[in-house]
Amino acid sequence: MENEKRYESYVLIHNIAKRHNVGTLARSCTAFGVSELILVGRRDFNAFGSHGSTSHLNFRHFNSLSLAKSFLKERDCDICGVEITDDAVAVNQHPFKRSTAFLLGNEGTGLSAKECEICDFFVYIPQYGCGTASLNVTVAASIVLHHFGVWAGFSERTREGNKFVVAERPTKQERKNYCAETTESIVEERRLKRENTSNGFFDESVKDDSSSNLLDGLFDS
């Protein structure tokens, strides 16, 4: 389909605090046709929740936001911040012009000033109920990516029965050194994070103190 080849979507995330969120985010990226998931800063994450979708998704890593921005601009790609700002446009208005990378903010504090500086425009997700001030980052990403796919004219995936057909995994796969935590450790991590509400999805203060870069074989560079 012409539009599918013409436009691409990317997801951009910066200095992950909740590493296991990337697994569920990767699942949404594959469902909505994202070309690449770009990590900036920290790159150690857990594939928990991805249901194998990381095998069908391209990853890329940069050490700084400026390098990520340069990469995207070389591909004539806009950077869209998903944030409620004075000039943000409702995502259902589809204010897209070309291939777009979506930068998602902290569920508690939103995008930092540094992150906002690299954005070309902003979208927000209208809410119609009064019980919450924000959405989980993966839920927000899914809504925004779906709207972009509709605007870009992406082809709907073939269905079989009550599910969509999953493509075969690539025969040649790079080494994927996922953070090999157990389900129990993830549950415990989530419990501790709930007790410490200051931890958000992005956290500029988080230091990567892992003994090695856990995904050296996963990223294009």
Where are the regions a protein language model picked out?
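Post-transcriptional modification and biogenesis factors for structured RNAs
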Residues: 1-221
